[in-house]
Amino acid sequence: MNEAEKISNLDEPRLFEEDGIEARVAALVIPLLKPLGFRLVRVKLLGQNGLTLQIMVERADGSLTVEDCETVSRTVSPLLDVENVIERKYHLEISSPGIDRPLVRKSDFFHWQGHLAKIETKITIDGRRKFRGTLTNITQDGFILNADKAAYGEAMYTSISFCDIIGAHLVLTDELIRDALKKNKDLSQQFIPEDNPTDSIQTLNFKK
């Protein structure tokens, strides 16, 4: 069993959490997801189509189907209505992480080692807080980011601790698309080459 398999499960904590209303929503839905075999990726309020509450979820293996989205919606929607966390009309969006997914758990970094990612840190490292590069040398404490386009004077390799990250996501590349489709059969069935690959995210929208 490799490092990714050891920690890739429904109980694995996320590296960072939401604030404000998003945090309240997360606290409500997380206990509902685990018994169904899902885990939360993130909660985000978006100012599109009026107001959209995006709840991004996945199974422990990273998969999610349209039927899964429907199941999650039927489960969390009644509680959100009762708690009235958002005191105005909104659209509820249940979605999968997609190909250029957020990296929110250590297992995500192990799973996608060797791929390009964007990282934001809460502390300044080598004079910066935003980085772009290839994920390498993943450990339980952090990783090394190999810069793909280092500017003059910038380090080619940056060591980053997991405890210092406030945001991370994969960068869409041809290599990532090929790898993602190999790993996720559900994703390969959704993927339409002519469209933007980010459209391969499974999404269901509901008016509230």
Curated annotation (Swiss-Prot):
This is Ribosome maturation factor RimP. The keyword Kinase does not apply. It is found in: Cytoplasm. One of its GO terms (biological process) is translation. It holds the Pfam family DUF150_C. NCBIfam families: PRK00092.2-5. Belongs to the RimP family. InterPro entries: Ribosome_maturation_RimP, RimP_C, RimP_C_sf, RimP_N, RimP_N_sf. Keywords: Cytoplasm, Ribosome biogenesis. Gene3D superfamilies: RimP-like superfamily, N-terminal. It comes from the Bacteria. HAMAP family: RimP (MF_01077). It comes from Bartonella tribocorum (strain CIP 105476 / IBS 506). Required for maturation of 30S ribosomal subunits. GO terms for cellular component: cytosol. Signal peptide: none annotated. The keyword Translocase does not apply.
